């Protein structure tokens, strides 16, 4: 796979990448890091259990087209437990037990806006223009951060950079160190975007400033100022 192109991705992945995002990211596929990432992923999926399933790796991009992104919520890497990861940051499929970070997200949402959610699938948020993007898009089962440093960070950097350069008035929500690291891209940008930052909602960090951040009401305040529809945070 020395001259990797998008056509050499597994078919299920290619089908999950919408044409709008494929066009925006077309230059990434011939870069050396992508060639190495594809080789690594091919081997990982062959020899280990990897999450999410291949047809869900690009679920965030599939769910929120490039020209419809209004908010970006950056996560870290997918949940490493069986059945949890489905390609949207912080989200779990219907019927899955809520992970601790998502419990804390819902706790803050209730404190902020009085909204209670009990199901963990955030698909309706994605459908409203929230790009639920992890910094790293795959993980080996039971091994958090096992796919960090393999190339995904460069790919998601490219996603964020494209949004910064080609779009205006996007709200970037940065929870945790990995997300804040990407904020360096924003600080170097002269384009008009908003940034909301806090510690990660995990139990280890939430009490350091995630609780009380009021990001959900702040997002809707900013959207309202831009005459854009506000987010309905209540899950169906």
Swiss-Prot record:
Q: Which family does it belong to?
A: Belongs to the uracil-DNA glycosylase (UDG) superfamily. UNG family.
Signal peptide range equals: none
**BP-aspect Gene Ontology terms:** base-excision repair, AP site formation via deaminated base removal
PROSITE patterns assigned to the protein according to its UniProt record, in alphabetical order: U_DNA_GLYCOSYLASE (PS00130)
Q: One Pfam family from the UniProt entry?
A: UDG
- InterPro entries cross-referenced by the UniProt entry: UDG_fam1, Ura-DNA_Glyclase_AS, Uracil-DNA_glycosylase-like, Uracil-DNA_glycosylase-like_sf
The source's domain of life comes to Bacteria
Q: Mostly located where?
A: cytoplasm
Residue numbers annotated as active site: 77 (proton acceptor)
| Cell location | Cytoplasm
Record's function text: Excises uracil residues from the DNA which can arise as a result of misincorporation of dUMP residues by DNA polymerase or due to deamination of cytosine.
Q: What catalytic reaction does the record list?
A: Hydrolyzes single-stranded DNA or mismatched double-stranded DNA and polynucleotides, releasing free uracil
Task: Supply the enzyme class, top level.
Answer: hydrolase
Q: What is its EC number?
A: 3.2.2.27
UniProt keyword annotations, A-Z: Cytoplasm, DNA damage, DNA repair, Hydrolase
- List the protein's name: Uracil-DNA glycosylase
What GO MF terms are annotated? uracil DNA N-glycosylase activity
- Gene Ontology cellular component annotations, sorted alphabetically: cytoplasm
């Amino acid at each position: 796979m020395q001259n990797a192109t998008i056509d050499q991705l597994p078919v299920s992945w290619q089908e999950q990448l919408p044409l709008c995002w494929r066009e925006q990211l077309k230059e990434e596929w011939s870069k050396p890091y992508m060639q190495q990432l594809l080789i690594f992923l091919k081997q990982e999926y062959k020899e280990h259990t990897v999450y999410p399933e291949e047809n869900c790796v690009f679920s965030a991009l599939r769910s929120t087209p490039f020209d419809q992104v209004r908010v970006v919520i950056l996560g870290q890497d997918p949940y490493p437990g069986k059945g949890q990861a489905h390609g949207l940051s912080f989200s779990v499929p219907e019927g899955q037990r809520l992970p601790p970070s998502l419990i804390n997200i819902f706790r803050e949402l209730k404190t902020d806006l009085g909204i209670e959610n009990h199901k963990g699938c955030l698909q309706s948020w994605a459908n409203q223009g929230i790009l639920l993007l992890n910094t790293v898009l795959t993980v080996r089962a039971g091994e958090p951060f096992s796919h960090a440093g393999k190339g995904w960070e460069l790919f998601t950097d490219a996603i964020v950079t494209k949004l910064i350069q080609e779009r205006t008035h996007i709200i970037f929500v940065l929870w945790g160190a990995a997300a804040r690291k990407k904020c360096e891209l924003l600080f170097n940008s002269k384009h008009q975007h908003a940034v909301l930052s806090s510690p990660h909602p995990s139990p280890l960090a939430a009490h350091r400033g995630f609780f009380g951040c009021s990001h959900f009401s702040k997002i809707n305040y900013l959207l309202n100022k831009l005459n854009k529809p506000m987010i309905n945070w209540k899950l169906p």
